[in-house]
């Protein structure tokens, strides 16, 4: 059972209670704070599409604290970030690992951030399969195609040579916020809230 705090706002028409995520959405903040799967991807995508419809010219902030997860769910979020008109500002608060690091790097250029004690990790996609040899081969080939796609996009978003991305993603590659900035995953480290 997860607990979601409720906040109460005073307005000229009285009090209004919101769950914390709805309140953040009013400020154009989408929070990705869980494993990336089809459910979390659908929620993030729906919020981005809603915010685009509300104001297509105003930035959307995507706060990320996630261990990563499904490649296809992550690519659905990535494609939506590229598709919508507003810039998506990304901010790592805590951890952005695997697919979450990929999304962090996919924010609008100049608008990708991390808090000082954030940790970022990239690695190659992994998966498991059992069954007939031909089915295992099909899934292995698919995984290699996805890996190639992720490496190319990450190279484009970070400015790192493709060969360096390939080498660094061979194993878990952990970075501090400062190292992620040098690497090109983020553009700056936020110490104080920028208004």
UniProtKB/Swiss-Prot annotation:
Belongs to the peptidase S14 family. The keyword Cytoplasm applies. NCBIfam families: clpP (TIGR00493), PRK00277.1 (NF001368), PRK12553.1 (NF009205). It is found in: Cytoplasm. GO terms for cellular component: cytoplasm; endopeptidase Clp complex. Pfam families: CLP_protease. The lineage of its organism: Bacteria, Bacillati, Bacillota, Clostridia, Thermoanaerobacterales. Cleaves peptides in various proteins in a process that requires ATP hydrolysis. Has a chymotrypsin-like activity. Plays a major role in the degradation of misfolded proteins. Its EC number is 3.4.21.92. Keywords: Cytoplasm, Hydrolase, Protease, Serine protease. PANTHER family: ATP-DEPENDENT CLP PROTEASE PROTEOLYTIC SUBUNIT. It comes from the Bacteria. The keyword Nucleus does not apply. GO terms for biological process: protein quality control for misfolded or incompletely synthesized proteins. Fourteen ClpP subunits assemble into 2 heptameric rings which stack back to back to give a disk-like structure with a central cavity, resembling the structure of eukaryotic proteasomes. It comes from Caldanaerobacter subterraneus subsp. tengcongensis (strain DSM 15242 / JCM 11007 / NBRC 100824 / MB4) (Thermoanaerobacter tengcongensis). InterPro entries: ClpP, ClpP/crotonase-like_dom_sf, ClpP/TepA, ClpP_His_AS, ClpP_Ser_AS. The active site is at 98 (nucleophile), 123. GO terms for molecular function: ATP-dependent peptidase activity; ATPase binding; serine-type endopeptidase activity. Disulfide bonds: none annotated. This is ATP-dependent Clp protease proteolytic subunit.
């Amino acid at each position: 059972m997860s607990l979601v705090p409720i906040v109460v706002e005073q307005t000229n028409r009285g009090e209004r209670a919101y769950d914390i995520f709805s309140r953040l959405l009013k400020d154009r903040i989408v929070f990705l704070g869980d494993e990336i799967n089809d459910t979390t991807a659908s929620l993030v995508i729906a919020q981005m599409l809603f915010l685009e419809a509300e104001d297509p010219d105003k930035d959307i902030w995507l706060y990320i604290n996630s261990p990563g997860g499904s490649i296809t769910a992550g690519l659905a979020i990535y494609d939506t970030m590229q598709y919508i008109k507003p810039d998506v500002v990304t901010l790592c608060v805590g951890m952005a690992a695997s697919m979450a690091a990929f999304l962090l790097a996919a924010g609008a250029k100049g608008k990708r951030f991390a808090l000082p004690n954030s940790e970022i990790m990239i690695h190659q996609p992994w998966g498991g399969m059992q069954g007939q040899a031909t089915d295992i081969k099909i899934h292995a080939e698919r995984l290699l195609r996805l890996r190639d796609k992720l490496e190319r996009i990450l190279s484009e978003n970070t400015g790192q040579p493709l060969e360096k991305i390939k080498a660094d993603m061979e194993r878990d590659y952990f970075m501090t916020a400062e190292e992620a900035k040098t690497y090109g995953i983020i553009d700056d480290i936020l110490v104080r809230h920028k208004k």
